[in-house]
Structures are given as structure tokens and as C-alpha cells.
Amino acid sequence: GLFGDLGTSTDDRAQLFWTSGHQYEMTDYREWTNGYPSVKFRNSNYFSASTPTVFSGTDFPLFRLADAYLMYAECVVRGGSGGTLNQAVDYVNALRTRSNATTITPGQLTLDFIIDERARELNLEGHRRSDLIRFGKFTGGSYLWPWKGGAKDGTAIPDHYNLFPIPLKALQANPKLTPQFG
């Protein structure tokens, strides 16, 4: 996984996953005791009584400095001008040091590293689908994850899944919109 063994990882971000009584790999996506349930936005003792599921309506951040640092690193690795590889590594290492993860060298800062670091740092914050599309890993079969395409071990999905559908009401309200069928 992204953190190695969750039971022994020194990366503080790995502690966001509750593993007591759970098996690491999901065998049935409908069972709460399968997979990696996260407590990232669980806040059962803050201001109000817990709900029966012990999850609260805690707001989550939309903009984070960590996201900006990782965007900077991605732009540099993709060849963008105005940034330096050393500064990108410093930004990434600031995040990793804060999380008690090992630092990296400039040679380790690759696009594959960045997409994995985005998954570790920004998990459950609503970025993953867009990240996978931007990195060319959301559709097709070259990058699989459990339950991709509805198959336990993952399977390829068609490229039209890279597109968000235009809601029917929007199409009906504006005849100039053209849907991209898939």
C-alpha cells in the first residue's frame, strides 16, 4: 500500500486508518470491516453528541498549503518554468517531515512519486479522481486498484469515464450544450 505495513509505518498519516478488527484488503465492498476505513474526518467528541455511526458532520478543508506544495512539485517535474527542482523537493520534504515520513532526494521526485504522495497527503479530500485523470491512470488497464471497474482485483474501464456527465436538466435548459456520449 501507500504506507507499507499500516501496523509498523512511522508515517503519521498512516495512523488515519483504523485497522482494529479489520482486514487490510477488501473482499466485499459492502462490509465496513473490509478495506481501509479512515477516521480522518471523524470527530465524535467535538461540540455535539456522536451519531450512531460515530461520524460527525465536521467540515473538511478545501484549500491546503500541502496541496499547493504538491502542485508546485508536479509542475516542476512536468517541465514548467518558474520553479526549481530543489525548491520542489524542499516543499515535499516539509510535508513528509511534518508527517514523520522519510525525506526524499531530487532523484526520487517523479510523477509516480507525486501521485502516490498526493494520495497519502490528501486522502479523502476529493482530489483522487481528478488526479488519476490528470496523470492518465483513471481509465484503461495499466493502473489497477481493488474494485476498479467493479472487479475485486480491478479491471480496465473505458476512457469515457474520464468525463463528467452534463446533467439532463442542464441539457434541457440550454440546447447549445452538446453531451459527449460514452
Task: Please give the residue ranges for each predicted region.
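Flexible, polar/acidic helix-loop-strand segments at domain edges
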Residues: 1-65
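Long, intrinsically disordered, low-complexity segments
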Residues: 60, 96, 104-182
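Extended, hydrophobic/aromatic-rich amphipathic alpha-helical segments that build helical scaffolds
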Residues: 11, 59-95, 111-125
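A broad, low-specificity signal marking well-ordered, structured residues that form hydrophobic/aromatic
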Residues: 39, 92, 130
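Flexible loop/turn segments at secondary-structure boundaries
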Residues: 24-25, 83-84, 130-131, 139
